């Protein structure tokens, strides 16, 4: 019988514990972790993500600000706004919601964020810390997946881990985090040949490609742990993952659902990293 990895329940448990830590920090040091999320344009999916982040931040006792900008805002104006929050001592985490309009360069915006406040973990300084084995701010989705492995007692050392998708947001940082735990990692992508054969060798299969139900049972060996990062809509508007959940569940030993799997953990790690940034600020 397959075991469901319940990211929603784990996220609720972690956020409740985080709220207590925030309360203690406020009582002992007079510090409230501050998070600002900047949303450019009216992308419907981005608006949902931002609302969820704001709701979770407020529930955990954070100072939460959301700045909504027109998609006509110029890059210089956005960088100027980021610089204001870089200098604001009440803000410990800055997140610019991606994707951005085409006329704004993502890399320039990420570079503009103070690495100490880069709670998304995308700044080159933070990725450098990750690649050198000294992670500080880590992209939130891979960080959340690592927490799931820990909470569910999933052994990583010596295991074959296959990641489908090589993005800077999930695939690449996920690979490094697994390497740090002594897993043997294969990072695959759209040009990978004989993908199904490679995936069938995985003890741990992590899928983040943005194609609904792409991974079927032909890609999965019996007893594998399957982590589905995908968030897609089917023809009826229903939220589905990159993994064909029903048929893959027949083979997997453990699997994350969509929704209710990885997504809630991503938001939880965003809050955790903002809290840790506030702690570091106190110790300076």
Swiss-Prot record:
Keywords of this entry: Amino-acid biosynthesis, Histidine biosynthesis, Hydrolase, Methionine biosynthesis, Multifunctional enzyme, NADP, One-carbon metabolism, Oxidoreductase, Purine biosynthesis
GO molecular function terms listed in the Swiss-Prot or TrEMBL record: methenyltetrahydrofolate cyclohydrolase activity; methylenetetrahydrofolate dehydrogenase (NADP+) activity
Keyword Amino-acid biosynthesis among UniProt keywords: yes
EC number, UniProt record: 1.5.1.5, 3.5.4.9
PROSITE patterns with a match to the protein in the record: THF_DHG_CYH_1 (PS00766), THF_DHG_CYH_2 (PS00767)
Pathway: One-carbon metabolism; tetrahydrofolate interconversion
GO CC term, one of those recorded: cytosol
Gene Ontology biological process terms from the UniProt entry: L-histidine biosynthetic process; methionine biosynthetic process; purine nucleotide biosynthetic process; tetrahydrofolate interconversion
Family, as annotated: Belongs to the tetrahydrofolate dehydrogenase/cyclohydrolase family.
Role description: Catalyzes the oxidation of 5,10-methylenetetrahydrofolate to 5,10-methenyltetrahydrofolate and then the hydrolysis of 5,10-methenyltetrahydrofolate to 10-formyltetrahydrofolate.
PANTHER family: C-1-TETRAHYDROFOLATE SYNTHASE, CYTOPLASMIC, C-1-TETRAHYDROFOLATE SYNTHASE, CYTOPLASMIC-RELATED
Subunit structure: Homodimer.
Protein name: Bifunctional protein FolD
Species annotation: Streptococcus equi subsp. equi (strain 4047)
Name of encoding gene: folD
């Amino acid at each position: 019988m397959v075991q469901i990895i319940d990211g929603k329940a784990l996220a609720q448990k972690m956020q409740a514990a985080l709220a207590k830590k925030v309360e203690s920090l406020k009582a002992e040091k007079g510090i409230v972790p501050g998070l600002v999320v900047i949303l450019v344009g009216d992308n419907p999916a981005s608006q949902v993500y931002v609302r969820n982040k704001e709701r979770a931040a407020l529930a955990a006792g954070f100072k939460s600000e959301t700045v909504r900008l027109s998609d006509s805002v110029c890059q210089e104006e956005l960088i100027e706004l980021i610089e204001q929050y870089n200098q604001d001592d009440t803000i410990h985490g800055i997140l610019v919601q991606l994707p951005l309009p085409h006329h704004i360069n993502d890399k320039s915006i990420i570079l503009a964020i103070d690495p100490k406040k880069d709670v998304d973990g995308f700044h080159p300084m933070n990725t450098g810390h990750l690649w050198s084995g000294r992670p500080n701010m880590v992209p939130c989705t891979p960080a959340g997946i690592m927490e799931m492995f820990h909470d569910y007692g999933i052994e990583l050392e010596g295991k074959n881990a296959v990641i489908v998708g090589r993005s800077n947001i999930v695939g690449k940082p996920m690979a490094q985090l697994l390497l740090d735990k002594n897993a043997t990692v294969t990072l695959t992508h759209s040009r990978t040949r004989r993908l199904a054969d490679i995936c069938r060798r995985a003890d741990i299969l992590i899928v983040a490609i943005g194609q609904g139900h792409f991974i079927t049972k032909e890609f999965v060996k019996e007893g594998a742990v399957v982590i589905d990062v995908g968030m897609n809509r089917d023809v009826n508007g229903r939220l589905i993952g990159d993994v064909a959940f029903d048929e893959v569940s027949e083979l997997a030993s453990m699997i994350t659902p969509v929704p209710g799997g990885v997504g809630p953990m991503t938001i939880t790690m965003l809050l955790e990293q903002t809290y840790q940034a506030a702690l570091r600020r106190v110790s300076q």
